[in-house]
Amino acid sequence: MANDQVILLDYWPSMFGMRTKMALAEKGVKYEYKETDPWVKTPLLIEMNPIHKKIPVLIHNGKPICESLIQLEYIDEVWSDASPILPSDPYQKSRARFWAEFIDKKFYDPSWKVWATMGEEHAAVKKELLEHFKTLETELGDKPYYGGEVFGYLDIALMGYYSWFKAMEKFGEFSIETEFPILTTWTKRCLERESVVKALADSDRIIEYVYVLRKKFGAA
Amino acid sequence: MANDQVILLDYWPSMFGMRTKMALAEKGVKYEYKETDPWVKTPLLIEMNPIHKKIPVLIHNGKPICESLIQLEYIDEVWSDASPILPSDPYQKSRARFWAEFIDKKFYDPSWKVWATMGEEHAAVKKELLEHFKTLETELGDKPYYGGEVFGYLDIALMGYYSWFKAMEKFGEFSIETEFPILTTWTKRCLERESVVKALADSDRIIEYVYVLRKKFGAA
């Protein structure tokens, strides 16, 4: 694996890219990072992900792997000698996959609509977002990490969104620390890991970016 | 595994349930089938899938596994001695997962909207559906099965929709056999398998069901 060529096409604010960066760091995989604005659609992005033309794309020895959750599975399988990402038990694995899918299917939409909408729609979206935070906190329960004692797949899947939490709080007018203390303790625990901290974007820079997006989406 | 208790909560027209039935049959797993109308939300369904309250739910020794693609992975891992479902190579596995996700993220919506919409929306949906069929045919290429020489994960993921093909053709006013001959040859190849044939619902019964749904959705 020493001569592997690993490239990550990613865009700095992407919660999905942050996941992949965490996983690569957990495994100690060195890679070349290529900043790729997904609004631009560079020839390399189109070549590597012709179907969705989205980042992140992980390119391993010339072969593209698309979609962040699929990348986590791939990274875990290929670099299997370092810290495992997915649980080894099939049932625990199915639960981790279920909740990661929940995050992208249910949590994702209100997580950005909370800063992109106004009025009645905003109120409905905020309510939904808070419900999903609650659900995710309940699923964590009193475990240190989602998978139990060890940081892994579902922690990565949700911590990918961490850089966006402050923007959600600002435009949603709520405090994660006040409303979800257990989840907050968990985020602090995850933030003790270098793999997590180094992968995350600065929360204030995300807020500046959100102002740009709000103009783009006509919400400001 | 001989004393395993396996229950499948499923509803006969579900393309997702048909996938799981195919996978269980491929592995030779015996199970109890419990017909579960997802519009009704039985106490057992709510208990086993409290988040989405959707079928299919695979219950293995009392533990629920939700979401059909996650079930395929689970079945492949737990009953690993019989015919493999996923490719063993991590890159091929990532491709199979990518395309299965494409089917549910992109193909699914137009696959039902083609019989649930009218007028301009219908025309747009039909165009999209045909494009996705073309994309899926191109991905198959000249391979006998999606994974190569052996029937597996992505074949199951797409063949789950087969019982609905006739309804798509009828309300979309197109012929899969004429437009997508390579895909048609592949469906015929898959239909030679008992695991597939036994899992599928009758296409004409699906069309009758579509008439019921069209009334429900106000499209008739």
UniProtKB/Swiss-Prot annotation, chains A, B:
Gene3D superfamilies: 1.20.1050.10, Glutaredoxin (3.40.30.10)
Domain GST C-terminal: 89-210
A GO term for molecular function: glutathione transferase activity
Binding site for glutathione: S14, M15, V40, K41, K54, I55, E67, S68
GO biological processes: glutathione metabolic process; response to cold; response to herbicide; toxin catabolic process
Enzyme nomenclature, EC number: 2.5.1.18
Catalysis: reaction(s): RX + glutathione = an S-substituted glutathione + a halide anion + H(+)
GO CC annotation: cytoplasm; cytosol
Residues in GST N-terminal domain copies: 4-83
Induction: By alachlor, metolachlor and benoxacor.
Name of this chain's protein: Glutathione S-transferase U26
Main enzyme class: transferase
Pfam families: GST_C_2 (PF13410), GST_N (PF02798)
Physiological role: In vitro, possesses glutathione S-transferase activity toward 1-chloro-2,4-dinitrobenzene (CDNB). May be involved in the conjugation of reduced glutathione to a wide number of exogenous and endogenous hydrophobic electrophiles and have a detoxification role against certain herbicides.
Family: Belongs to the GST superfamily. Tau family.
InterPro entries registered for this protein in UniProt: Glutathione-S-Trfase_C-like, Glutathione-S-Trfase_C_sf, Glutathione_S-Trfase_N, GST_C_Tau, Omega/Tau-like, Thioredoxin-like_sf
Gene expressing this chain: GSTU26
